[in-house]
Amino acid sequence: MKQTITAETSIEIDASPSEVWNAITTAATIKKYLMGTNVSTDWKEGSPITYEGEYNGKKYKDKGVIKKIVPEKIFRSTYWSSMAGKEDKPENYNTVTYNLDDNPDGTTIVRITQDNILSDKEKEHAVSNWKMVLQKLKEVVELAAPKN
């Protein structure tokens, strides 16, 4: 069996887990922080999830299956990218997990992990991509979050 690598990154968002959860499970909000991506799913474990859009002038349709949902805590799905140049077969899917941790100060730590990465170069790309996504998520959520 091949050794695989896991990419991980996190960010602190000045909002409640509920506000962050709504942002990661609402298609219209996802589109704001995930490069204009249109997401389709019913947000239930075992259901398919698709990501469609255009990146650098190239259309894509990525997909996966929702594996675990714990509201305001965990969102996990498999993920295959049409742009990765890999065949659409189970061993080429990553598992992407969003973990939300509630801080006593009212902020939320969002940690994203992506597994089944085959090289350090692929890991660097994943970490860079997720950092960009998390920064944009933070901006979108904090802009919408009511301030006390």
Model-derived segments and their meaning:
Residues I109, D115-N148:
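A conserved amphipathic terminal alpha-helix motif
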Residues E12-D14, D101, T113-I117:
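Solvent-exposed residues in well-ordered beta-strands and their adjoining turns
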Residues V39-D42, K59-D105, D115:
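Hydrophobic-ligand binding "helix-grip"
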Residues T37-Y51:
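A solvent-exposed, acidic/Ser-Thr-rich amphipathic alpha-helical stretch
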Residues T4-S10, P48, K61, I74, ...:
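Intrinsic-disorder/low-complexity, polar/charged segments enriched in Ser/Thr/Lys/Arg/Asp/Glu/Gln
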Residues M1-N38:
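Hydrophobic ligand-binding cavity/cleft-lining segments
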Residues V20-W21, I30, I49-Y51, I66, ...:
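Hydrophobic pocket/interface hotspot
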